[in-house]
Amino acid sequence: MKKIVSIILTIFLSSITYAQEERISSTIDSTKSPELVLIQEFKVKAALDAVWNAYTTKKGWESWAVPLAEIDLKVGGIIKTNYNASGKIGDSTTIITHIVNYVPKRLITLQAEITDNFPEFMKEDAKDFYNVIYFDELENGYVNVKSFGIGYKNNTKYLSLMNYFITANEKLLLQLISY
């Protein structure tokens, strides 16, 4: 029965597109394995340098995403962020994201460290979670950003988590679009 429900959800969700605004497209897609991919895509009217810097510099992160950030931009580097303006980098609310690789102004692959602040069910799957982000410079001063959240399992807990991430990410990405 679980397998049938999982198959039905996979088929159903592979065709659903979520969008807070037309400016951000959020899609849950299935892969050949029992995993789901969260694809989020949007366009920003800004120079490629500015959008790349928004993702890869302290000033960039603190301009649109978080009040506190530290960045060590290199393969094997780390992005440390904190959504708590009263907190500090290194406290229990710091989010640590590893930079797996990058191609300047084209692509960055990230992997978040799963801490005690994440749901328990994610901890055993921590090695599977990646975010691959592509940056494409378009005509007329726009940049297309396409993010692939990889490693989500196709079950009820992860579907609920993905719905949370869709809403939270779209709100955050709207801040980047306005930045």
Regions found by a protein language model. Name each.
Residues 18-70:
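Hydrophobic ligand-binding cavity/cleft-lining segments
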Residues 45-49, 73, 100-108, 134-144, ...:
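A short, structured loop/turn motif at beta-sheet edges
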Residues 59-94, 102:
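Short beta-edge strand/loop motif at the mouth of beta-sheet-based domains
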Residues 51-52, 61, 79-81, 99, ...:
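Hydrophobic pocket/interface hotspot
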Residues 1-24:
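Bacterial Sec-dependent N-terminal signal peptides
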Residues 40-42, 68, 94-101, 128-137:
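Hydrophobic/aromatic beta-strand elements that line small-molecule binding cavities or substrate pockets
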